[in-house]
């Protein structure tokens, strides 16, 4: 989870995409 957050780079759009991908994963 923390690793995914780091990948988001604090981007709002990226955060949403990362959440969707990690939720689907």
Swiss-Prot record:
Q: In which pathway does it act?
A: Energy metabolism; oxidative phosphorylation
The kind of enzyme this is, by top-level EC class, is translocase
Catalysed conversion reaction = 4 Fe(II)-[cytochrome c] + O2 + 8 H(+)(in) = 4 Fe(III)-[cytochrome c] + 2 H2O + 4 H(+)(out)
What GO terms describe the biological role, i.e. biological process, of this protein?
A: oxidative phosphorylation
Work out whether the entry's keyword set contains Translocase: yes
Q: Where in the cell is it found?
A: Cell inner membrane
An example of a Gene Ontology cellular component annotation for this protein is: plasma membrane
* E.C. number(s) listed in UniProt: 7.1.1.9
Note the topology in the membrane: Multi-pass membrane protein
Q: Which GO terms describe its molecular function?
A: cytochrome-c oxidase activity; metal ion binding
Q: Which UniProt keywords apply?
A: Cell inner membrane, Cell membrane, Copper, Electron transport, Heme, Hydrogen ion transport, Ion transport, Iron, Membrane, Metal-binding, Respiratory chain, Translocase, Transmembrane, Transport
Annotated function = Subunit I and II form the functional core of the enzyme complex. Electrons originating in cytochrome c are transferred via heme a and Cu(A) to the binuclear center formed by heme a3 and Cu(B). This cytochrome c oxidase shows proton pump activity across the membrane in addition to the electron transfer.
Record protein name field: Cytochrome c oxidase subunit 1
Q: What are the top taxonomic ranks of the organism?
A: Bacteria, Pseudomonadati, Pseudomonadota, Alphaproteobacteria, Rhodobacterales
What's the encoding gene here?
Answer: ctaD
